[in-house]
Amino acid sequence: MATAASNPYLPGNSLLTAGSIVHSDAAGAGGGGGGGGGGGGGAGGGGGGMQPGSAAVTSGAYRGDPSSVKMVQSDFMQGAMAASNGGHMLSHAHQWVTALPHAAAAAAAAAAAAVEASSPWSGSAVGMAGSPQQPPQPPPPPPQGPDVKGGAGREDLHAGTALHHRGPPHLGPPPPPPHQGHPGGWGAAAAAAAAAAAAAAAAHLPSMAGGQQPPPQSLLYSQPGGFTVNGMLSAPPGPGGGGGGAGGGAQSLVHPGLVRGDTPELAEHHHHHHHHAHPHPPHPHHAQGPPHHGGGGAGPGLNSHDPHSDEDTPTSDDLEQFAKQFKQRRIKLGFTQADVGLALGTLYGNVFSQTTICRFEALQLSFKNMCKLKPLLNKWLEEADSSTGSPTSIDKIAAQGRKRKKRTSIEVSVKGALESHFLKCPKPSAQEITNLADSLQLEKEVVRVWFCNRRQKEKRMTPPGIQQQTPDDVYSQVGTVSADTPPPHHGLQTSVQ
C-alpha cells in the first residue's frame, strides 16, 4: 500500500479508471463501466484500458464531478493486488463472485456479463461499493470502521441481500444522497448493468419479488441506506416509487423494518411488509386479532337454538284464550288445580304446584313461563278428554292426590233448623251433633263444620268492645225492655254523640 501503484490519489495513477470507482445512484441504479472516461476528463470512445501505460483517470477527471464519482477504500486495496497480477485489476473479480451465496452470485454474474457486453474492457470492471462508513466527499481517505472482514469470502463486498454483517453495526456516516447527473460517456453501460443486476436479483430472490416465501437467514442484514450488488451502489427507490418507476432505477431491497431496527422475529417475515404489486396470502404471524367472530361464536341468534321457534311461539291473545278454555274444561272434568299440577309431575316429569296452575289461569305468569306451560297443559287436556267416562291414569292420579270434598249445598229448611239450634246452643257437644245430623239426614262432619263456621261468623259480627251475649240473653232482654230503660244500642249512640 506504500507503493505508487497502490496510491489512488496520484493524478497519473494508471490502475484506476472511472468505471472501477464510480457508483451510480437510484436514477441509474448501476455500477461502473463505461466506454469513455467518467467525470468529464477521461479518455473517449473505447480507449480507456486497464494497462499500466494508459492513464484513464487524471486529476481533473477525479475532481471534475465529485457528486457522481466516489472512491472506496476497498477499491484502493485492489491496486496492489492488480499490480501483482499482471497489471489487471479485475483478476479477483470472479473469485469474489464464486465466494458469494447462490442468489448473489447469480446476480453478480449477470451484472458482470452485461458490463462485458457493453464495454470494450476485457473484464467486468465494476468497482466494489463501500459500506455506509464511506464519507460523502471522496478525496480524504475514509475511516476504517469496525467492519469485520471475512477473509477469502470477502464479506466487505456487501452484495445486495447476499451477506449478513457478522460484526457490530457501522458507526460511520450514511452514504451520500443520490446524484442527479452522470457523464454521458458511461451512462448507457451503467444502466445496462443495473437492469441486468435487478433482473437477476428478482429472479433469484422470489421472496423479495413476489413475497411467497421467507428469505434464508443469511440474506438478512442491518445496513441502513444503500447497498451494493457486485460493486454497484443501489440506493432506495427514487421518485418512481417502490420497485423503480419511471427513472427509478433498480429496486431497493432495503427493508424498512430492518432500518428501524425491528426484532428478528419481524425480520423473518419482512417480505410481507415490502412494497410490491403482487398480492400474497395473509401470514398467520400477522393475524393477531381475535380468533374468530363467526362459526361457533357467531353471536346471539346464530349459535343458540331457541327451543321454541318463531312459528311455535304463541301470542298473548292465544295464551289468554287457552287459559280461559283450560279453566272451563278443568272444572267441567272435575279436577282441581292441585290435581292438574300433580298429574303433570307424574306424567311428564315436571311437577307444578296448585299456585302455578292458578296463576296460569289468571294470566299472572311471565310470558316465557306461560309459553313453557301451555304445551304441557294442552297435552293434559287431550289425555283427560280421551279418558272421559272410564277410569284412567289421570283419575287414579287425582284420587291419589289431596282429597278435597266438594262444597256442600245446604237447603234452606235444613239451614233454618241449624240456625235455631245455634241460638239455643252455639257450641253443641259431639253427641248433640250426631243426633242433629241424623235428624237432618246430614253427615256428622257437615254439621260440625257448620257450627264451627257459624261461631266464626258470630265473632266477626260482634264488635270487640261489647261483651258477647248468648242468644238466650238477647231474647230475655228484648222481653223485659220497659219504657224507662232504652235498649243498649241507644246508649251507645248517645255516648258516640
From Swiss-Prot:
Gene3D superfamilies: Homeodomain-like (1.10.10.60), lambda repressor-like DNA-binding domains (1.10.260.40). Brain. Residues 465-483 have a biased composition (Polar residues). Disruption phenotype: Neonatal death at least 36 hours postpartum. Loss of both Pou3f3 and Pou3f2 leads to abnormal formation of the neocortex with dramatically reduced production of layer IV-II neurons and defective migration of neurons. Keywords: Developmental protein, DNA-binding, Homeobox, Neurogenesis, Nucleus, Transcription, Transcription regulation. Its main location: nucleus. One of its GO terms (molecular function) is sequence-specific DNA binding. It is found in: Nucleus. The keyword Ligase does not apply. Residues 269-286 have a biased composition (Basic residues). GO terms for cellular component: nucleoplasm; nucleus. Residues 32-62, 121-189, 230-316, 458-497 are annotated as: Disordered. Residues 32-51, 240-250 have a biased composition (Gly residues). GO terms for biological process: cerebral cortex radially oriented cell migration; chemical homeostasis; forebrain ventricular zone progenitor cell division; kidney development; metanephric ascending thin limb development; metanephric DCT cell differentiation; metanephric loop of Henle development; metanephric macula densa development. Residues 403-462 bind DNA. It comes from the Eukaryota. Residues 311-385 form the POU-specific domain. Residues 133-145, 170-180 have a biased composition (Pro residues). PANTHER family: POU DOMAIN, POU DOMAIN, CLASS 3, TRANSCRIPTION FACTOR 3. Transcription factor that acts synergistically with SOX11 and SOX4. Plays a role in neuronal development. Is implicated in an enhancer activity at the embryonic met-mesencephalic junction; the enhancer element contains the octamer motif (5'-ATTTGCAT-3'). Belongs to the POU transcription factor family. Class-3 subfamily. Homodimer. Can fully replace Pou3f1 in Schwann cells of embryonic mice and rescue peripheral nervous system development in these animals, although severe defects in forebrain development are still observed. This is POU domain, class 3, transcription factor 3. It comes from Mus musculus (Mouse).
